[in-house]
């Protein structure tokens, strides 16, 4: 079974909100404990879940009726339990120089800190959220966010307690990511948790006419997407596709039969290497071969010095595939790590179909790791 972290995040985010609702509005104290467990599991899935604790505390601070719960031992017991549940994440980070925390915080905040405003990033975020929610629902989310924020800032008026509760888990994520989008690329899935409560609020605003329009657009959109999935009308010029990876793994196995001791590597981020590691029995690496950060490949226990003197097969996808010609030369960043290389014929998967993809192949000799 293979999954992105967003799947368990959305599951435990939803369960956390349900439990917090019962704990607060139905005064079922044991649900604070369950909420603590689910919030912890949500954080273990993805660090975005920290916004759950922030959301519940923000709600209680702004809620005149339920502010008294800030001194409730049940609230703090739930929060402590949520931290305890995250212990495996903290322990792993402690053992690995806080690598995942650094990746999610310092590396990304340094990019944001440069504060280079790029309108294309903002409009890109708007575009992919329009794609995710479709125009009617997305527009309603924008409208009610504006109305509630305007009332709070100009009239110091807050909505009903239950609406405020829903907003506490929507506004920080939805507005927060849009605020940083002009200076940092916000990915399509980052705002998804906010829509768990955001869509409920949208239901309070949508008219029957708009609901009908959303339904029609949704049906047309899903038919179009399903047709693309089944018939693949439009080729995807990217590694962001599920097509061809299994066949690539099989063909790489065949190409490497002449040197069974050779390892496989790619340096295009992590996708090609990750797919080959999944679909191949060969030893597969990423940028760690050339002494560069390689995300998860840095923590699989491999010591590159152990592969000194071995040969390797370098695999790289031709994302803008136009012909079946060879690349011509090995990328310069790789050549210092090998004595010599020979370019082999490219691997073509799903040949003769619209799904056809191309991968360059180099046979690199005598690996010399460097510090």
Regions found by a protein language model. Give the residues of each.
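Hydrophobic/aromatic-rich transmembrane helices and adjacent perimembrane loops
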Residues: 132-135, 139, 164-167, 171-174, ...
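Short acidic/glycine- and proline-prone juxtamembrane loop motifs at membrane-interface regions
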Residues: 1-8
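Transmembrane alpha-helices of multi-pass, membrane-embedded glycan-processing enzymes
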Residues: 9-12, 16, 131, 198
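Membrane-interface transmembrane helices that cradle and orient dolichyl/undecaprenyl
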Residues: 16-31
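Membrane-proximal, lumen/periplasm-facing interface regions of secretory-pathway glyco-
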Residues: 184, 188, 211-260, 269-285, ...
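Residue-level signature of transmembrane alpha-helical entry/exit and packing/kink sites
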Residues: 6, 31-35, 48, 74-78, ...
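Transmembrane helices and adjacent periplasmic/lumenal helix-loop junctions
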Residues: 33-62
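Transmembrane-lumen/periplasm boundary regions of multi-pass, lipid-linked membrane glycan transferases
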Residues: 53-163, 169-178
């Amino acid at each position: 079974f293979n999954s992105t972290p967003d799947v368990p995040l959305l599951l435990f985010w939803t369960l956390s909100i349900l439990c917090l609702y019962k704990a607060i509005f139905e005064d079922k104290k044991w649900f604070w404990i369950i909420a603590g467990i689910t919030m912890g599991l949500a954080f273990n899935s993805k660090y975005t879940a920290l916004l759950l604790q922030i959301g519940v505390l923000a709600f209680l601070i702004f809620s005149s009726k339920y502010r008294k719960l800030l001194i409730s031992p049940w609230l703090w017991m739930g929060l402590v339990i949520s931290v305890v549940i995250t212990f495996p994440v903290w322990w792993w980070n402690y053992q690995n120089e806080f690598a995942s925390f650094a990746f999610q915080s310092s590396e990304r905040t340094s990019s944001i800190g440069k504060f280079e405003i790029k309108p294309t990033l903002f409009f890109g975020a708007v575009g992919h959220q329009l794609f995710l929610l479709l125009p009617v629902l997305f527009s309603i989310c924008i409208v009610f966010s504006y109305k509630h924020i305007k009332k709070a800032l100009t009239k110091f008026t807050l909505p009903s307690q239950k609406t405020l509760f829903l907003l506490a888990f929507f506004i920080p994520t939805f507005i927060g990511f849009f605020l940083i989008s002009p200076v940092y690329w916000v990915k399509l899935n980052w705002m998804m948790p906010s829509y768990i409560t955001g869509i409920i609020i949208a239901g309070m605003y949508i008219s029957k006419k708009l609901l009908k329009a959303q339904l029609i657009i949704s049906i047309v959109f899903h038919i179009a997407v399903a047709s693309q999935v089944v018939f693949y009308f439009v080729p995807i010029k990217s590694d962001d596709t599920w097509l061809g990876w299994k066949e690539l793994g099989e063909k790489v196995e065949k190409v490497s039969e002449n040197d069974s001791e050779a390892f496989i590597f790619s340096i295009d981020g992590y996708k090609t290497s990750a797919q080959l590691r999944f679909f191949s029995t060969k030893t597969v690496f990423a940028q760690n071969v050339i002494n560069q950060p390689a995300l998860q490949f840095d923590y699989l226990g491999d010591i590159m010095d152990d592969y000194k003197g071995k040969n390797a097969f370098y695999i790289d996808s031709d994302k803008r595939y136009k012909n079946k010609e060879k690349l011509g030369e090995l990328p310069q960043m790789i050549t210092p790590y090998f004595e010599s290389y020979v370019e082999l014929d490219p691997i073509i998967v799903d040949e003769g179909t619209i799904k056809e993809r191309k991968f360059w192949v180099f046979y690199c000799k005598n690996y010399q790791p460097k510090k």
